[in-house]
Amino acid sequence: MAAEIICVGTEILLGDIVNSNSQYLAQEFAKLGISHYFQSVVGDNIARIHSLLEIAVQRGTEIIVFTGGLGPTPDDLTTEAIAAYFQTPLIERPEIVADITTKFAQRGRTMTPNNRKQALLPEGAEILPNPTGTAPGLIWQPIEGLTIFTFPGVPGEMKRMWQETAVPYLKAQGYGQIVIHSEMMRFRGIGESSLAAKVNHLFALTNPTVAPYASKGEVKLRVAARAESVAAAKKLMDPVVAEIKAIAGLDYFGSDGASLPLVIGDLLRTRQETLAVAESCTGGGLGALITSVSGSSDYFLGGITAYANAVKINLLGVNSADLQNQGAVSETVAQQMALGAKQALDSDWGIGITGIAGPKSDDSAKPIGLVCIAWADPQNHVFSHTYRYGTDRDRELIRYLSACDALDGLRRYLKSDKS
């Protein structure tokens, strides 16, 4: 079963709004076992909508889901375009007019004449009710082997209509007997090409499938399988997932929603240990990542943003001679910051970060992207590492990667039980 998504709206093309509808519908297709290979965005233009319909029909698409362009204004052209393409007249549906009139009355308003446009559907189309808005959608089979759905572009309206009407309709047609289940495996400390080389033999699999994805600050592998149930799909996937974990080792940190801050929190909570941080170049970004997890106060005591050298000396106990001789960006200073945070806040673990995020460097001998990170364990053993993110990356990315590597380094120490 081949389906595709066509999102209509010039505002999407201009980047004025984020197209979250495609992501949602793609995930819903997978739950119903419906494969889809194409997504398109088109402006409010009948000729361009026709061109996409022509392509979809020619390649034998069986389900087309449109979102957007169903409202009462002149630029809402989706229904008109679909009807014209299949040379079918538009018929005003009195039940839709009545529904729109009622909704206006409930809001203490009178329906304006242009709203009647939303009651026009192609002859033979089934109404797809909109419980909250005034623009209904449609379900229509204009030619043999093709079903068209239309939905408003408003995500909340679209999602409710999909769940309450489209999903039951599709299940009644026999869809949903096969599901597509997937697991997004997440990795740190290894590049996409390096990971791909290690698992290259798995890319030839057909069920389950394995596909790599690059993401900000991490690499992902999507393992997916088709089966009659989620449990059956997982049974197909489990050996492959286990093999990937064995190959990746500590570079694998979790799957799906298991973010680095969440993983760190679980590890610290399990060990009943606490964390404090001292930050310079990240300016509180590390603390922000940690506290993005609800309940992080169970293990995160706090942080000190020590941007000035005087703060490093007075609050963290960094040796002034080391600052003078080695500079603020050095592993020696990062180590003292980690110990200083740990001692100042009486935590089990401490992290210190100092670096040059750019766009300029105050030290000609130290390039932009040079960051030193240190970790102090419960026994006051200190570990450190120097990262070189490159001079071509922007300030915010360097700060973000630094915070992520600080967490990832702690994760590796905790997982290796080096404390």
UniProtKB/Swiss-Prot annotation:
CDD domains: cinA. It holds the Pfam family CinA_KH. InterPro entries: CinA (IPR050101), CinA-like_C (IPR036653), CinA_C (IPR008136), CinA_KH (IPR041424), Competence-induced_CinA (IPR008135), MoaB/Mog-like_dom_sf (IPR036425), MoaB/Mog_dom (IPR001453). It comes from the Bacteria. Belongs to the CinA family. This is CinA-like protein. It comes from Picosynechococcus sp. (strain ATCC 27264 / PCC 7002 / PR-6).
